[in-house]
């Protein structure tokens, strides 16, 4: 159940109490880590931190507060592939499950998430979410990332395994 920071603490506790026999993960129910910390012990469901996971320091803080039972993490939110790799290592050291998600990009971020997801300990890996099925076309028409029967093949080849058609990037905002 993804609260997207929209629940008050009162409503988050109420939902968890009224649905205590229904198994689910409560993803980012409240707006702040402080709000989540104030109710965490009164909930019947594990909490995944999502929108508040903006950097490694915040991830470590949420783990230290004991309020992160797992994470829904986007590569772009945490700061790119290097930070995502560091984040994943922290989660592995603490046995915390997590995702490796796309933040509504195209083939480039899809390939990055797919490659990164393939490196996560399978016991802790909650999956990779890609926006691919909501986006028309591909930057790389030959090797573009595709979700088939719920699975994603890790791209082969150099780098991320895709070769974007440079023609799709025609209208430069700036050239340096």
Language model regions located:
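Catalytic-core signal marking the mid-to-C-terminal active-site face
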Residues: 156, 164-176
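Short beta-strand elements of ligand-binding domains
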Residues: 1-2, 49-51
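Metal-dependent enolase-superfamily TIM-barrel catalytic cores that perform enediolate-based chemistry
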Residues: 1-43
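Shared catalytic-loop signature of beta/alpha-barrel
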Residues: 23, 31-48, 54-151, 155
